[in-house]
């Protein structure tokens, strides 16, 4: 990834990022700030008491707007005031298990939230490029051993996955109906890991909490295979898509899977064993299914389209991703300067 090219493109540009207070959103905000973008974020308050957004002090480095993506009137006012040139939509209710407990809220946020952002883009005279970030779970999951391709059927099972399938369809409809000349893409990313994720019911945060407390973590679905990748992998692709489709819409816009190579699609037990290796003393795990709601058992992405169109390939393998995650969390647990640690990891990633 050519960071100088990204900095040259984004420096001084008006960028609107929804979901900027979340795990991925905070990392992306940091990168855009390093690029010199005039960044506005639109999101609810951070989703957990301990969170990377506050740890990095991002609110002081950007125009951070507290708002609900379901509130169209407020979102319109932000668009009218900021006049964004580049829009990345990441705001979501992102947890599968929460979607079973709060299905209506999940659909309101993930479907109508997408309608609202697309409507603001439709009414805007300033937007030059738009990206909707969805998920690898948008596909009808057939528990197949081959990776899903972008033309496979969209039909997520649970309310979270299904709402993201709907978000894709909303984007496709707005593109065809209203935004034929505007560069519009969606990115369907795999499971991301990295420092700064403190969400519940996610495997690495659960491991960190267990390691810090000295208690073994419970692994619910040890054989579930996911396309795990470090958070920086998809984020730089998002920025590349937004930039390149603005420069050449016909060549670069589209719907793209973003995930690791097949060899890095590992099961939960392998991931936790790698975490144990990296963390060292004080961490252990037990395997015990809690009989929770349905989650996909086998999920891979075929990313050949992204590799062909963008010339992209993963930089990190899954064990590199674990090592970077553990490095970040251990630094945080020791009270180190996490802004400096985060910048260091970003720059080291770019130099690999």
Which residues make up each language-model segment?
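NAD(P)-dependent short-chain dehydrogenase/reductase
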Residues: 142-147, 151, 157-160, 165-246, ...
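Glycine-rich phosphate-binding loop at the start of an alpha helix
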Residues: 93, 97-100, 204, 300, ...
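Residue-level recognition of oxygen-bearing side chains
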Residues: 15, 74, 105, 112, ...
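Short-chain dehydrogenase/reductase
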Residues: 99, 190-191, 255-258
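C-terminal substrate-binding subdomain of Rossmann-fold SDR/epimerase-dehydratase oxidoreductases
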Residues: 34-37, 67, 211-352
